[in-house]
């Protein structure tokens, strides 16, 4: 007698056993037939590839979570940081800066103080005070109000420009424009001069009633301060270079007429550029 669990070949062919075409593994389509001649390695490779994709997605999610928590190293061992815009640290830390004021600039600072502190307080959101005991201007950021990380440096540059001898309006330009710089050099850096020779060099740079200095400023769109043997130039990078070349040529002994001719050429080039 045949065992009741055994099935005859004819029974299977006649369809007595139901055959399901859908797979019990959710998400994978197993309805396609695979030939017997096909290699099983291809199937294993595809499964490995799907597993690798899932692992990469999981790694990316874990890396994002780690980036939010702290520093994460990439495959090369370099740290990965989130962008500053997406980070929640928009507040500026409490920092302070002290700018010393020369004795000969204390009186102009006191007279113009009512015009100096409003740009720092209203525009840069800084806390400012003038310390008469130490003869300095103290700047401090406020964590609740200061939003620009470079506000403290801009304020210090503004006060420093005023203490060097620049006009108040020219110094305020440092707060409004980001591409302005101050370059300082001495006459002895160009040529070693002493006594009357040094005085004549300073006079050649200034000119009669300051005409030569004004001509250089207007042609190169800069501002120049002659503080004894020191020369301070305020302006853009290329403009400072043009003004410095004119001043250096005067120190080295070039005739003022030749310098004026070069300034005309420089002014025409600037007009064509802008």
Swiss-Prot record:
Organism: Kluyveromyces lactis (strain ATCC 8585 / CBS 2359 / DSM 70799 / NBRC 1267 / NRRL Y-1140 / WM37) (Yeast)
Molecular function as annotated in GO: RNA binding
Compartment(s) where it occurs, according to its Swiss-Prot or TrEMBL record: Cytoplasm; Nucleus, Nucleolus
GO cellular component: cytoplasm; nucleolus
Family, similarity comment: Belongs to the PNO1 family.
Complex and partners: Component of the small ribosomal subunit, ribosomal RNA processing complex (SSU RRP complex).
InterPro entries: KH-I_PNO1_first, KH_dom_type_1_sf, KH_PNO1_2nd
Keyword vocabulary terms for this entry: Cytoplasm, Nucleus, Ribosome biogenesis, RNA-binding
Pfam families: KH_PNO1_2nd
Segments forming domain KH: 195-247
Role according to the record: Required for small ribosomal subunit (SSU) synthesis. Has a role in the processing of early nucleolar and late cytoplasmic pre-RNA species.
Protein name: Pre-rRNA-processing protein PNO1
Keyword Transmembrane helix: no
Record has Isomerase as a keyword: no
Annotated region (Disordered), positions in chain: 1-39
Gene Ontology BP annotations: ribosome biogenesis
């Amino acid at each position: 007698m045949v065992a009741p669990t055994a099935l005859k070949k004819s029974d299977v062919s006649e369809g007595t056993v139901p055959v399901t075409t859908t797979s019990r593994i959710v998400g994978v389509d197993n309805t396609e037939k695979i030939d017997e001649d096909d290699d099983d390695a291809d199937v294993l490779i595809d499964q490995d590839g799907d597993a690798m994709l899932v692992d990469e997605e999981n790694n990316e999610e874990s890396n994002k979570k780690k980036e939010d928590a702290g520093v994460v190293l990439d495959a090369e061992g370099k740290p990965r940081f989130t962008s500053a815009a997406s980070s929640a640290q928009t507040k500026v830390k409490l920092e302070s800066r002290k700018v010393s004021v020369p004795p000969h600039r204390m009186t102009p600072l006191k007279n113009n103080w009512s015009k100096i502190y409003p740009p720092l307080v209203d525009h840069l959101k800084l806390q400012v005070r003038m310390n008469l005991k130490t003869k300095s201007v103290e700047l401090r950021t406020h964590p609740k109000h200061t939003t620009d990380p470079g506000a403290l440096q801009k304020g210090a540059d503004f006060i420093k420009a005023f203490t060097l001898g620049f006009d108040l309006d020219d110094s305020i330009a440092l707060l409004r424009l980001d591409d302005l710089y101050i370059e300082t050099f001495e006459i002895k850096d160009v040529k070693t001069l002493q006594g009357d020779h040094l005085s004549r060099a300073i006079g050649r740079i200034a000119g009669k009633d300051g005409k030569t200095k004004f001509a250089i400023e207007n042609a190169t769109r800069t501002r120049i301060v002659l503080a004894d043997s020191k020369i301070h130039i305020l302006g853009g990078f290329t403009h400072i270079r043009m003004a410095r070349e004119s001043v250096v040529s005067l120190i080295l002994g070039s005739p003022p007429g030749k310098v004026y001719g070069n300034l005309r050429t420089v002014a025409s080039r600037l007009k064509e550029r802008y």
